[in-house]
């Protein structure tokens, strides 16, 4: 039965949940509800109340469910990704920000807070490989008075970053992180990066990632995926002042490699790994000598 036929919202969501579960979607009930809420223009709380009433299924619901069943990312269908306190615009050509990156942002924010208490004058932060602009937008809106700069190379991702950083005060540069922002060399307080880091022969497990995230945002270059992380670390070393802070996200299995990368360069001290909310090694940081 088509979910667009005259059935109740509750029955439509129940049917959509079954369709998505059969397709292997990891959170079928939540996604079914979010798709309905998106079409109805309501939040999940209001939708929950509507499910107990006599509301009809919204027109076009089955089409969106079919797209999600084909493993198109939920965020691409709704056009929205939630990150920390932000509602970001996302779609084809841009990496969908992940919840685990929120903890990386928090590390940078904590350092900026301490620096602001210890120093007079404005602070500066750089996001290398900003993608959707999630990290830069978080820094710009949560760290008062910090001058934020963001760099993105992808022609496809750059417009999404422009949209998400509009009105935040952040400065966005369209260019390669390896040679960007030379005018800031030796002056920046904090650098954050979530660079591409997947090894060349690794195949992402999730179909949403494998089929829809841009390869440019996934694969780090080289057999071990370390080319772009190495470049990010080198640029951070160039940009940061002595005593500046660098934090970079990576895969759980790359923690030792990232620590060795920073420790072996001679540019960093107090190198350490950080776990995310699931207890997995998610980031490595260091302080500029």
Please describe what each predicted stretch is.
Residues 260-289:
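Core SAM-dependent methyltransferase catalytic element
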Residues 29, 36-111:
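Conserved AdoMet
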Residues 80-81, 201-215:
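Short, flexible, mixed-charge acidic loops at enzyme active sites
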Residues 247-265:
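Short, electropositive alpha-helical surface patch
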Residues 100-206, 231:
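Conserved SAM/SAH cofactor-binding pocket of Class I
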Residues 87, 147, 169-171, 269-272:
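Conserved beta-strand segments of alpha/beta enzyme cores
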Residues 1-48:
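Non-catalytic accessory regions of SAM-dependent methyltransferases
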Residues 155-158, 208-241, 245, 251-253:
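Glycine-rich S-adenosyl-L-methionine
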């Amino acid at each position: 039965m088509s979910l667009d036929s005259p059935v109740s919202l509750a029955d439509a969501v129940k049917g959509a949940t079954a369709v998505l579960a059969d397709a292997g979607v990891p959170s079928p009930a939540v996604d079914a509800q979010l798709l309905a809420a998106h079409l109805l223009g309501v939040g999940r709380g209001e939708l929950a109340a509507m499910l107990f009433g006599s509301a009809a299924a919204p027109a076009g619901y089955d089409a969106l469910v079919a797209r999600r069943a084909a493993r198109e990312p939920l965020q691409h269908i709704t056009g929205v990704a939630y990150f920390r306190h932000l509602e970001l615009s996302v779609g084809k050509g841009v990496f969908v920000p992940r919840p685990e990156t929120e903890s990386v942002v928090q590390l940078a924010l904590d350092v900026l807070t301490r620096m602001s208490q210890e120093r007079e004058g404005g602070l500066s932060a750089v996001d290398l490989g900003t993608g959707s602009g999630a990290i830069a937008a978080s820094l710009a809106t949560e760290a008062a008075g910090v001058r934020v700069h963001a760099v993105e190379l992808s022609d496809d991702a750059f417009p999404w970053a422009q949209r998400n950083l509009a009105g935040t005060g952040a400065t966005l540069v369209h260019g390669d992180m390896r040679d960007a922002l030379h005018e800031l060399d030796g002056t920046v307080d904090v650098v954050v990066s979530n660079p591409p880091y997947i090894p060349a022969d690794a195949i992402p497990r999730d179909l949403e990632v494998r089929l829809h995230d841009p390869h440019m945002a996934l694969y780090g270059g080289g057999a071990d995926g370390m080319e772009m992380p190495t470049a990010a670390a080198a640029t951070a070393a160039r940009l940061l002042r002595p005593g500046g802070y660098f934090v970079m996200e990576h895969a759980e299995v790359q923690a030792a490699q990232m620590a060795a990368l920073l420790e072996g360069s001679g540019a960093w001290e107090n190198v350490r790994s950080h776990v995310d909310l699931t207890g997995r090694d998610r980031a490595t940081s260091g302080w500029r000598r």
